[in-house]
């Protein structure tokens, strides 16, 4: 049911419509701010101005508008970053398990990536002192959103975690312990090695691996800033493996898979995404990976 704006909001909206018709865009912007101050949002559409109640939390226009704290020193030990693309119950399950099992100094950051249905749950979960929230209006691709989370972080260790990954014990502490070795740049739950002439990957680990999957992947924040996630990767699939090789190519350290107590629930990114988009973007990423790394045997691990 559409909520009817109160008379003061409607009056400002009518004035804004007139200002836009007169091409007085400065007045239009000023009136939009006045409408927002009354708790309503004014959005322009092909059918005219649309008024909707604003949510009880700030919403950035896009991930480019999120705070950039990349120049700040480390201020905490670890952040677990969750990219929320919907499925609020999955988000709740993942976060509640983190709060139960992860070390008490680990902070959880949720990025509501332009979702129509998960923002309120993200806001509710952020009432917990260890949970922080970010909301954007326009959804971003996987790597773009993930790198924005890295830039907004101030932890020494940044953990990429998919909401389908659910802790059944402390799955974060062992990753942090692995990163105490200065020769290790990243630690994760699932590792893989190249097989079949670089045309496929096979499960590997525990121990040193050629690539880590992004279901649960801890990396030093400094490394994630120095070697960003592949910017052309709009979809998650294969982008984590491409990034793994980029980190190792840069000589920033080794990657290790660690046996941790987690389970994977339904992976929405794969099973519930548009299959045409999924296959197209996955192939583009893997083709880019092959073009850069195929034949680079110095990046292979002896088995």
Predicted regions and their residues:
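C-terminal, non-catalytic tails of nucleotide-sugar-dependent glycosyltransferases
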Residues: 63-75, 185-188, 193, 206-207, ...
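Short, acidic, metal-binding catalytic loop of nucleotide-sugar glycosyltransferases
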Residues: 96-105
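A conserved acidic beta->alpha catalytic loop
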Residues: 112-121
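Glycine-rich, basic loop-to-helix element that forms the pyrophosphate-binding segment
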Residues: 136-153
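Donor nucleotide-sugar recognition loop
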Residues: 214, 226-256, 260-262
């Amino acid at each position: 049911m559409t909520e009817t704006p109160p008379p003061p909001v409607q009056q400002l909206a009518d004035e804004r419509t007139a200002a836009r018709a007169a091409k007085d865009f400065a007045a239009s912007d000023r009136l939009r701010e006045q409408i927002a101050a009354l708790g309503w949002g004014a959005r322009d559409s092909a059918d005219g101005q649309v008024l909707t109640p604003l949510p009880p939390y700030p919403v950035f226009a896009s991930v480019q508008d999120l705070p950039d704290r990349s120049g700040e020193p480390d201020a905490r030990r670890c952040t677990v970053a969750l990219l929320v693309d919907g499925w609020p119950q999955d988000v709740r399950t993942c976060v509640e398990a983190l709060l139960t099992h992860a070390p008490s100094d680990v902070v959880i950051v949720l990025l509501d990536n332009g979702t129509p249905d998960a923002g309120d749950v993200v806001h509710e979960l952020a009432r917990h002192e260890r949970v922080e929230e970010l909301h954007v209006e326009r959804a971003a691709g996987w790597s773009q959103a993930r790198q924005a989370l890295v830039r907004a972080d101030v932890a020494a260790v940044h953990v990429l975690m998919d909401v389908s990954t659910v802790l059944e014990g402390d799955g974060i502490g062992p990753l942090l312990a692995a990163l105490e070795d200065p020769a290790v740049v990243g630690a994760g739950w699932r590792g893989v090695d190249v097989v079949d002439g670089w045309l496929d990957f096979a499960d590997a680990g525990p121990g040193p691996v050629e690539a880590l999957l992004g279901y649960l992947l801890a990396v030093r924040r400094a490394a994630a800033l120095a070697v960003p996630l592949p910017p052309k990767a709009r979809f998650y699939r294969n982008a984590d493996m491409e990034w793994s090789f980029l980190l190792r190519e840069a000589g920033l350290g080794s990657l290790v898979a660690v046996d941790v107590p987690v389970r994977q629930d339904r992976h929405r990114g794969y099973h519930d995404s548009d299959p045409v988009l999924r296959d197209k973007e996955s192939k583009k990423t893997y083709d880019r990976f092959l073009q850069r790394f195929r034949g680079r045997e110095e990046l292979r691990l002896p088995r």
